[in-house]
Amino acid sequence: MTRFVGLMVLALVAAACSNSTEPQHLRFEARTSVSQSTAITVQTEVTVINDGPTTTQIEVSTCPRAIEGFTTPERTGAPLWRIYGGEVCDAAARIRMLGPGDYYVYHFGTRQIPANLPIGNYYLAVDMGYQLVPAGQFSTF
């Protein structure tokens, strides 16, 4: 029983820290499709891949992740905008185990970019909690 309680406490501590510490050996790749018809909309997905030799855990709750827009390719400083989806956050920690070589894909619904952007290049990123993941770019004319 003591061993089980110890493992449970460890799991809870790891879950509580999952948004503030970067898991080891995880690689993030993002893809975004941009539609520029009447309004600029984006659809983004982020794949997290375990490149390490051991199983690790990631948080996969329903809480929305922000898609952020920057004016520099480095994506540093405060973003011009931050768009959250309409997902309902139930505040329940959901953990998924990723073995070596395993991956998980986060799908984000369609998000509308602010309409009043000046002409220029914009660089997208997704705030994954662990890190800011570059997610493509687009230009306005």
Regions found by a protein language model. Give the residues of each.
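C-terminal motif of bacterial Sec signal peptides marking the signal peptidase cleavage site
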Residues: V13-A16
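Short beta-strand elements
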Residues: Q131-F141
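Short, hydrophobic beta-strand segments
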Residues: Y106-N116
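Bacterial signal peptide processing site
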Residues: S18-S20
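Structural beta-strand segments of beta-rich domains
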Residues: I40-T44
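Asparagine-centered strand-capping/turn motif at beta-strand->loop junctions
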Residues: V48-P53
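A short tyrosine-centered beta-strand micro-motif
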Residues: Y103-Y104, P118-M128
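The feature marks short-to-medium sequence segments in extracytoplasmic or secretory-pathway proteins
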Residues: I58-P100
